[in-house]
Amino acid sequence: MKRNILAVLGVSAALVLTASTISQDVQTKKTLNDGTVVINTTTIGSKIYGYRDVTPVEISLKGGKVVKVEALPNYETPDYFKLLKDGKLLESWNGLTAEKALEKEVDAVSGATYSSKGIIDNVREGLKFYLGKTDKK
């Protein structure tokens, strides 16, 4: 019994250390060799939830325009999250300047409203960060 408790405590400690290491390694902003700026909202959007949990994204911008929004790993229900991809929610900001993308009113995808809102809010936070309109780092 004592061994089982120690084993569980050891595994729990390892998981906590791994989780904290992962979150520390997240780079919020990086610039690729071709000049593309990639904003990762894992940290700045850590309190933005979809239906089940946080919904971080990476926003790629080149020349001040959104090139791509990509959903990062999350715990949203796969079938509902697929509705977002099929509904092209992630493409809603492509081709827009960061300023225009931030101003754009994007509708949630029917059937995946909470997940949509999480993505939309993460994109907004990421764009604010890119434009220097936030104190979060």
Feature roles, as predicted:
Residues 2-10, 17-137:
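Flexible, solvent-exposed loop/hinge segments and secondary-structure transition points
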